A protein has these predicted regions:
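Nucleotide-activated sugar donor-binding and catalytic core shared by glycosyltransferases
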Residues: 1-245
Length: 245
């Protein structure tokens, strides 16, 4: 059982019987959330005092060095867009202090404090120092930036999570751990890959200036996810046939 035609070709080239190589797809697609209830999305926006027409950048799974990328983006865009909110979700919530050190505290609201009742007092940077909420934040995003992709060493995080929710994922050159889904999204124009984080602000400005472009990217991204789901069922059916023989 293999994920793609490319993998099938490789096994056959190595000597496998072509009639015994089956393409079932990538089970990672089956685990992707493709819808979050609009009431949950509205409650999340309301809890953070983000208007329905606010521009939201979600920078997910930040790793070492990504906080500098986030700071650069914020410094370049905060004055240009008064309706911009920047949501930063570190891969490890206990690293929030590293992020905090790069921003003015008066601009930052911690999600943990927000959940305890602290209201937004005009902060436009939200640090998600909680677990299990990234998908919800992706669901209200205008665009998503994938952490761990801008510097060598981590080799990427999952671009399928925002893609499944119709949000365009933007990632850097280091995607080895998620190369297949990244390539598939890029092939069908459902994601944006940049060679350098210095390009981020300009691409974000382009997407903000043309909302339909980001919407179309997101629509294509979600379609790619839906088209590639079903690998788990194919695998189970194949194994069931093998067992019954």
């Amino acid at each position: 059982l293999v994920q793609t035609e490319e993998y099938a070709k490789r096994f056959i080239e190595l000597g496998a019987d072509a009639e015994k190589v089956y393409i079932v797809g990538n089970i990672k697609y089956d685990a992707v959330t493709t819808e979050v209830d609009f009431r949950k999305r509205n409650r999340l926006r309301t809890s953070l005092d983000i208007p329905s027409d606010g521009k939201i950048i979600v920078f997910g799974s930040l790793r070492d060095g990504d906080e500098k990328v986030a700071k650069k983006i914020w410094d370049e865009l905060k004055e240009k867009y008064s309706d911009l909110w920047f949501i930063l979700a570190p891969r490890h919530p206990d690293k929030k202090d590293i992020i905090l050190n790069h921003f003015d505290s008066k601009d930052v609201l911690l999600r943990s404090e927000n959940l305890k009742g602290k209201k937004n007092q005009g902060e436009r940077i939200i640090i998600v120092d909680t677990l299990g909420e990234l998908i919800q934040f992706y669901s209200i995003a205008t665009v998503a930036i994938i952490g761990g992709t801008w510097f060598p060493g981590v080799d990427g995080h999952n671009p399928l999570e925002p893609a499944g929710l119709g949000v365009v994922p933007i990632f850097g050159p280091y995607m080895r751990n998620f190369q297949e889904p990244a390539d598939r999204l890029l092939k069908d124009n459902g994601a944006i890959q940049l060679s350098d984080y210095n390009e981020l602000s300009s691409i974000l400005e382009r997407l903000f200036a043309s909302p339909y472009e980001s919407i179309n990217y997101g629509t294509r991204a979600r379609k790619i996810i839906l088209q590639n789901q079903g690998a788990v069922l194919k695998t189970i059916n194949f194994l069931a046939r093998c067992i019954s023989k």
